[in-house]
Amino acid sequence: MKFVLLFGVLLVTLFSYSSAEMLDDFDQADEDELLSLIEKEEARAKECTPRFYDCSHDRHSCCRSELFKDVCTCFYPEGGDNEVCTCQQPKHLKYMEKAADKAKKFGGKIKKWFG
């Protein structure tokens, strides 16, 4: 039994040492890569399509609201043959955002009363 325990401790020690070395190598090698990805993400975020604007050129370019991303919704106007696409917020997400806002305000009041 002592041999199994000693072998287990040795195995855990070797595993933790090797994983720590791998993490150090990963952190040093990919730090610059991570910064470049963050810069690209910031640049991409500036190109979003505002709510109720045309999104037919890129249906995944709608901006985010407070909690959720808007959705590109396409429809045919009455009496027209051309498809129109605009960024819109689905009603269920709108209601969820309102409920979250009310919960935040109520939480602030509770904190004020008891804090």
UniProtKB/Swiss-Prot annotation:
InterPro entries: Spider_toxin_CSTX_knottin (IPR019553), Spider_toxin_CSTX_Knottin_CS (IPR011142). One of its GO terms (molecular function) is toxin activity. Expressed by the venom gland. Residues 21-44 form a propeptide. This is U3-lycotoxin-Ls1a. Keywords: Disulfide bond, Knottin, Secreted, Signal, Toxin. Its main location: secreted. The presence of a 'disulfide through disulfide knot' structurally defines this protein as a knottin. Disulfide bonds join 48-63, 55-72, 62-87, 74-85. One of its GO terms (cellular component) is extracellular region. It is found in: Secreted. Residues 1-20 form the signal peptide. Belongs to the neurotoxin 19 (CSTX) family. 01 subfamily. It comes from the Eukaryota.
